[in-house]
């Protein structure tokens, strides 16, 4: 690019000077010398056998243009010499979670259509303005949206907010995962949520993979680069686990492999979560746990969530849905109030780190932060 600019500038200056000489003949019938970019720099007014002094000013202006082209070329290289966010050095999420400060984070997912990517970027900036401590970005089923996911996560970092990039390993090979990790580092991403990933529909057996379990992925990430690694946890137990104790053992294996913190799947019953935390601590798991909540905004959403999880709807939430389910705006307000109450109860009981599943709706996180503005400051 820089070479092209210099060549173009050279040709322009040569043509301008040659044209000037043809308009202003040299005295004594002298033939103008052959001019090129380098020789023009040495020509000075000398008697009657040189072009007029103002032609040198044209060349000088050409040098100024070249200089600014050169600066424009070097600036991005200098600016990106280290992977940093606009808000400062890249931050490890574990540093946030190790503090007593209340943190509010949220989850984003990439659009299904590439044409909607700009809308996702606009959502990133809208949420960044409202203020969150970090944003997680999902990976798509089987990593199908990896390019869009990394683009969004990099945009999150550029907005001044730490990004937590999801990474699934189901059916993955080590070289493929290593390539994605390199792309993450190049995009300024230092935080990864390591997941096995969902079993493909219609498959009884898991596809062949270098990472049979999420703990294998955690270990590989820690060996590969300087990443802060989180993992998912299920307060009601993973759907594929036979018992909650079996699931808790899996959590411990992830932590032993190097997991820095855990983020729960969404739950709607705080008492169930507190019981889960007691049992997790009894297993010796001491990493920070981020509580995941999601405001209910429509009745069908409730049915789908609890059908997939295989758990019963808490009686308090069922009452809300039954009373307001036929009135969308009323249900939206009631759902936000239910989640806000959950968050207040969690913080009051010492669980200061909250992750909100927003379904890509900036107004959700904005509403929660405004309602709990004084609570969050504590």
Spans of features found by a protein language model:
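Active-site mouth loops of central-metabolism enzymes
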Residues: 105-119, 164-175, 230-246, 324-337
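Active-site-adjacent beta->alpha loops and helix N-cap segments on the catalytic face
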Residues: 93, 117, 143-154, 173-179, ...
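Polybasic, lysine-rich low-complexity intrinsically disordered segments
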Residues: 11, 30-31, 36-37, 48-51, ...
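Conserved, mostly hydrophobic/aromatic
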Residues: 107, 135, 184, 254, ...
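Active-site beta-loop-alpha junctions enriched in small/polar residues
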Residues: 108-111, 138-142, 166-172, 197-199, ...
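N-terminal amphipathic alpha-helix/helix-capping segment at the start of soluble metabolic enzymes
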Residues: 88-106, 113, 378
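Active-site pocket-lining/capping segments in soluble small-molecule metabolic enzymes
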Residues: 208-234, 284-336, 341, 371-378
